[in-house]
Design a protein with these regions (language model features):
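Conserved beta-strand hairpin/beta-sheet module of binuclear metal-dependent hydrolase folds
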Residues: 125-185, 310-315, 319-325
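C-terminal segment of N-terminal export signals and the immediately downstream linker at the start
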Residues: 1, 22-45
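Active-site metal-binding motif and surrounding structural segment of the metallo-beta-lactamase
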Residues: 157-158, 168-219
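Metallo-beta-lactamase
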Residues: 134, 158-169, 221, 226-404
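N-terminal export signals
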Residues: 6-28
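Divalent-metal (often Zn2+) His-rich catalytic cores of metallo-beta-lactamase-fold enzymes
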Residues: 39-59, 330, 349-410, 414-449, ...
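Feature captures hydrophobic
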Residues: 33-36, 481-496, 500-507, 512, ...
Length: 620
């Protein structure tokens, strides 16, 4: 019987590797690196470096293995253009720039860049189209005004809006462009939130007045339990999540060939005001059909897929299938680097399969909250089947390896997307990557522990790193060896030891600069924008410090105001530092007259604030 180590070593993908166009380039192979130590004049940072020979070789290999002959995405993304976005900048009400497409114009000036993976460059060029598009008569989209798309469906009395972007300023600008060319002055007659992520509801105040919602004039429709999961996923860990977004989304990383080039889902996240108006109607059943402003719609609830609560929508009279964010032009996240509960890829696959057989066999157009539509039943079925198989394979094959002993710290060097799916552009990793998604599958089923007792109660990095530095002979020896590994193109090995030095000596700027050089080369090599952004944003911080600038805030006061009282009290319990409340004892009974809620909050132990819905005898 083989040991786990022998089994892993026998696999064709063994070793530290990068997935490149359907095959792997091992870190120690000749396909990686030259010395890149001289600052690059064209770089946005004075310490920035050019791609090394090893990085150039990785990108060259990628170009030869990608399915560039398939041009269908290029035709689909430009189909139906009515009007482009004339002003490439959208200002926030607070006075700063909320959205700027001008900074991405460099992408269209060259066919290739030696610091951008060719597959990622292709995706960023596709996302560089912006404006108002006709999907079919009666359905329109504004794309390129935010990370997500906003869609308009013609109703009996007005326009039904699907997913009103991230911030009110971009949603308002999209609505203005739409009204100038198509809207005919008709109002918003309904709003549909497809799911709980902020880029699908945050701009609602840019298109509808809350008074019209509360009066019943404009219904806001969402999947069941929308508010609970919106708050738990976007607000409870909002501060930590917003910090992690700096890496995954490169929020303050300069846009340039050596920096930020897009986010895969769209070009970026707008930096305006996020708002939330609570839904007035929930889709509760697995399949629920009703009219929205005279348009018959069939809603398919898909809980625990791309989001904790999400729904697809089919419009039978138009043969139009809205797949929310369950099907996009990319592999999505099973585990998202910004942080969120790990998603269920098998469940996700099954709901895509259900949509295929319920609606996809007759649909003639499929559109979603990101990217571009697909036209024709054959094309729709191709995409649905491919994405269904992608998530099922990832779930099943990762667990197959896990059951043979591959751990969470090894699976990313073992799992590969099947060759037949790698050759489909819509299965490439422009949001989720095979590396971090495969680890997410193991985390979902087995948790973080790799069965090595050493990792059960590990020292914190700042505590363990000084010992490593001591045992390796001190800082200078690590610097010398780290530079040598860097110059040999062995970047993953180099980061392993130089990171120890930075953790042990956080003020050692020479060590931070070397680690930044290592991260930079790794970033250039990535097809996945989340991985690229994380490496390059980290390099930027190591060289400069934490950047400052305007970003969207998922825990904004407006979002907090939309909470129920119980959700707000839960949030208050998280914000409270229990260490400062030792010895305190209290009970608060609450009645909120505007909605009749009755709650009790208790602090009777030195541990936590607990809240529950009650009918108190003597509320105060």
């Amino acid at each position: 019987m083989s040991t786990r180590r022998q089994f892993i070593q026998s696999l064709p993908a063994a070793g530290t590797a990068f997935a490149v166009a359907g095959h792997l380039v091992l870190e120690d192979s000749p396909a990686l690196g030259q010395v890149a130590t001289v600052p690059l004049k064209e770089h946005f940072h004075p310490k920035g470096k050019a791609p090394s020979k090893y990085t150039l070789d990785v990108l060259k290999q990628a170009r030869t293995g990608l399915p560039f002959a398939d041009q269908r995405d290029l035709d689909e993304q430009k189909r139906g253009l009515i009007a482009p976005m004339k002003d490439l900048k959208i200002m926030a009400d607070a006075g700063h720039v909320a959205w700027d497409m001008e900074r991405f114009q460099f992408l269209d000036k060259q066919d290739e860049f030696d610091s951008i993976h060719p597959s990622l460059l292709r995706q960023s060029k596709l996302n560089n189209n912006y404006g108002l598009y006709e999907v079919i008569p009666g359905i329109y989209q504004v794309r390129g005004f935010d990370l997500s798309d906003i869609s308009f469906v013609r109703g009996k009395t007005g326009w039904i809006v699907f997913d009103p972007l991230v911030t009110k300023e971009t949603a308002r600008a999209a609505w203005k462009l739409f009204q100038q060319h198509v809207g005919q002055g008709m109002p918003v007659s309904a709003v549909i939130y497809s799911h709980t992520h902020g880029d699908h509801w945050g701009g609602v105040r840019g298109i509808v007045d809350e008074a019209d919602v509360r009066s019943g004039k404009v219904p806001v429709i969402a999947p069941i339990d929308f508010m609970d999961f919106t708050i738990s996923e976007n607000v409870y860990a909002g501060n930590a999540m917003n910090r992690r977004l700096f890496y995954q989304y490169g929020l303050l990383l300069p846009a340039s060939p050596h920096g930020y080039v897009g986010q895969g889902l769209g070009q970026a996240v707008s930096a305006g005001a996020i708002g939330l108006i609570a839904p007035t109607r929930y889709v509760e059943k697995a399949i629920e059909e009703f009219e929205v402003d005279g348009v018959r719609m069939v809603f398919q609830n898909t809980p625990n897929t791309e989001a904790p609560r999400e729904m697809n929508t089919y419009i039978p009279e138009m043969k139009a299938l809205w797949m929310a964010e369950n099907v996009i032009a990319s592999l999505h996240n099973i585990y998202t680097l910004r942080g969120a509960p790990v998603r269920d890829p098998l469940n996700w696959s099954k709901y895509i399969g259900e949509a295929l057989f319920r609606f996809g066999l007759e649909a003639e157009v499929m559109f979603a909250s990101h990217h571009w539509p697909r036209w024709g039943n054959d094309r729709i079925q191709e995409v649905l089947r491919g994405q269904r198989d992608l998530y099922a394979h990832m779930n099943n094959q990762v667990l197959h390896f896990a059951n043979q002993g591959v751990t969470i710290n090894e699976i990313h060097n073992v799992y590969e997307v099947p060759k037949g799916l790698q050759n489909k552009w819509f299965c490439r990793g422009y949001h989720g990557s095979p590396q971090h998604n495969s680890r997410g599958v193991i985390q979902r089923y087995l948790g973080f522990w790799d069965c090595n007792p050493t990792t059960l109660i590990p020292l914190s990095p700042g505590e363990s790193a000084p010992l490593y530095v001591e045992m390796m002979g001190g800082a200078q020896k690590i610097m010398d060896r780290g530079r040598q590994l860097h110059d040999e193109g062995r970047y993953l090995h180099a980061q392993e030891i130089v990171n120890k030095l930075v953790q042990a000596e956080p003020q050692n700027q020479a060590a931070k600069d070397l680690l930044a050089d290592i991260f930079e080369q790794l970033g250039y090599q990535q097809e996945n924008p989340g991985l690229r952004n994380s490496y390059l944003a980290a390099a930027y911080e190591l060289r400069t410090g934490i950047p400052q600038g305007e970003t969207a805030n998922s825990s904004s006061p407006d979002v907090i105001r939309a909470m129920s009282t119980e959700l707000f009290l839960n949030f208050l319990g998280i914000r409270m530092d229990s260490r400062k409340a030792e010895g305190m004892r209290f009970t608060i009974n609450l009645i909120t007259p505007d909605n009749g809620e009755k709650l009790s909050s208790n602090w009777k132990t030195p541990h936590s604030l607990t809240s529950r819905v009650i009918k108190p005898k003597n509320p105060t």
